[in-house]
Amino acid sequence: MTAVLLASLLLALFLGSVRMSPADVLRALFGIGEEKYSIIVRALRLPRILAALLAGVGLSVSGLLLQSVTGNRLASPNIIGVNAGAGFAAILTLSMFPRAVHALPFAAFLGAFAATLLIVRLAASIRASHISVILAGMALTAILNAGISFISLLEPEVITAYNDFSIGGLSGVTAERLLVPAILIVLSLALTAVLAPQISMLCLGDRLAASLGVRVSVIRTVCLLCASASAAAVVSFAGLLGFVGLIVPHIAKRLVGIEIRHALPAAALCGAALVLLGDTLGRTLFSPTELPVGIVMALIGAPFFLILLLGGRRHA
């Protein structure tokens, strides 16, 4: 996977709507080439590459955690209300402040994190079992989606701006916007790595994990917070980017097995490579028209989702 990620990095760096030779790109990287090339590479392509890497890592680790602690192989940030919370906050902000498009990332982050805290409280009040987390998330998602639909009916003029956010994309992202999300994603990844042995025991079942000394409710709650914080961080700069948190954990487990300490780095690498490749394809295949990475991920993820559903029915 490291080789695939490196290849993805090179493709993202050298390909774009503006054609440049490899020599031009390398000179621009070091600030010694033509000014227009330096701007394209250093101000546009590099921040976008970093955003794609962070989005891939954040959503993949979030999905892996959610699938591990809930015991549901279809769990993802979408299902526990993170994306719905972000979407509701975004459309509410647009309805109250129609010109505040620049505030959408911040509002989305607050909405996603508020949804996370609510899910944690709900799950904790009913002993944070893996079933209660999923049910609480589904209920919250349904309520928030109803709220989004209601606001859309009352304020139809906000639909266009909201749709741009809900599709998910990395166009126009800057390095400054990535600082806080990067810190949250790295901290979540580090804490997950520390808790990997206990998460692996949690995958054996609550009773067996408890008999082995794992504080089941505490570990599940911490993992839920890490997963949601990581996903919320991605939402703040990439919008509602779907399917990554669903499909990448399955790819990682097929490559290295289900042990969390092996699946975690594999998921991070796979997710980073997948989103980076998807974004590169989206901005180059139909150049100069750009296809948002959210659409590319949906084209890849929807068939994969159907395969998972069919596989689950056969196992059932």
Q: Language-model segments: which ranges?
A:
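Alpha-helical transmembrane segments in inner-membrane proteins
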Residues: 1-316
